[in-house]
């Protein structure tokens, strides 16, 4: 594609405060956040200049792609791997909670996550689906992603379509 790829080593909070890393986030065309443990990513990025740079990138029309635990961390709250309690997410999807490796036939975890959080809707992302985050809470489903507008609502499939960070009407 004629693009240079660069790895930014943001593993700890001090990495997220490093000016050079924040400049690189601001200057690149797109950012990819890999999997891992959501708690660790949140711990490294919460309240940091790097998180501000990611949010600014989205607001300016840049692209942020997150998979697995990184996608979960983008929501308003996350289920911690340490005891299952709810912890604040990064808020890049400020009205949503995200469940990855989602199976619509087994949606109990997403419903419980949404019920216990300030999120207005839930997004279930199967292994073959993805979300591309955009400005002002917009996102685009790649493959099939599922939206749950409330803990008791029906699951709505979003298939390769743009959407907004608002619950479905109804």
Where are the regions a protein language model picked out?
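General beta-strand structural signal in soluble alpha/beta enzymes
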Residues: 6-9, 32-33, 64-67, 122-125
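Structural motif
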Residues: 20-23, 56, 88, 115
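Residue-level detector of flexible, active-site-proximal loop/helix-junction positions
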Residues: 12-14, 71, 129
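Class I SAM-dependent methyltransferase SAM-binding "motif I" and its flanking Rossmann-like core
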Residues: 34-108
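C-terminal and late-domain segments of enzyme folds
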Residues: 79-80, 84-170
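Residue-level preference for short coil/turn positions at secondary-structure junctions
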Residues: 26-27, 60, 118
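N-terminal beta1-alpha1 cap of cysteine-dependent amidohydrolase-like domains
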Residues: 1-30, 34, 168-170
